[in-house]
A protein has these predicted regions:
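Short, Lys/Arg-enriched N-terminal segments with co-localized hydrophobic residues
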Residues: 16-27
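Hydrophobic alpha-helical bundle signature of multipass membrane enzymes
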Residues: 25-128, 136-163
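Membrane-embedded catalytic cores of phosphoryl/pyrophosphoryl-handling enzymes
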Residues: 120-222
Length: 222
């Protein structure tokens, strides 16, 4: 429901209506205004626009490429690196399932559908806005990499933050979409790093390592 300020209507509303409707409407308007201000930065410097467009469209592929390199890179700590990859992958899967469920229960329209002045320069479709899948999944990966102290983890964390900002810059998400995605990622990260989950991840990593190494060996022997 869109909030529009009307002083006469507000005075006529009951105290109960004011208690629940007014704060929610004000919060949503403040969020929309924040997106509007950030989105106005677009179009002022073409190099920045191109960079943000690339990051918001394709930034998530950097995490996939990083994961592949981390998995196949040789070294003494390969087992530990692969466990980190599996944990990060499971986190993304669980986060995506939660996001899908939330989207079915609550469809929040994207900022550019509420205000035509917001420039949707990526041409993104008007599907559910909450939570931000890109911000959520990149945060889930970054949390795991930082915890396991993987090489380049800080750079990947910075990329996750930049990817989240780019979604605001492009007018595709509200700040609470980003924060909500981060909260889901943090919760999933906490669960997957419990002892019971860690034991499962070790077994799964062993099985996947055997499979990938066997395929690689067969490919080299041909």
């Amino acid at each position: 429901m869109k909030f529009r300020w009307n002083s006469r209507r507000f005075c006529q509303e009951s105290s109960l209506e004011r208690q629940f409707i007014f704060p929610r409407g004000i919060f949503m308007d403040l969020e929309l205004d924040a997106v509007r201000r950030i989105n106005k930065l677009a179009g002022q410097a073409r190099p920045v626009d191109l960079m943000m467009d690339l990051i918001t469209r394709y930034g998530h592929w950097a995490f996939l490429i990083y994961g592949i390199l981390l998995w196949f890179a040789p070294g003494k700590n390969q087992k530990h690196r692969r466990e980190s990859c599996v944990a990060a992958f499971l986190a993304v899967c669980l986060c995506s399932v939660i996001s899908l469920a939330v989207g079915k229960l609550w469809h929040r329209g994207r900022p550019f559908t509420r205000d035509r002045q917001i420039w949707n320069f990526t041409g993104h479709k008007a599907n559910a806005s909450f939570p931000s899948n890109h911000a959520m999944n990149s945060a889930a990966v970054a949390f795991q990499l930082l915890r396991d102290r993987m090489p380049g983890c800080r750079w990947m964390a910075c990329l996750a933050g930049l990817l989240a900002f780019s979604r605001l810059f492009a007018g595709m998400h509200y700040p609470s979409d980003i924060l909500g995605g981060g909260a889901i990622a943090a919760a999933v990260h906490g669960v997957l790093n419990k002892p019971f989950a860690a034991a499962f991840i070790k077994k799964l990593t062993g099985a996947l390592s055997l499979l990938s190494d066997s395929i690689l060996y067969i490919g080299k022997s041909r």
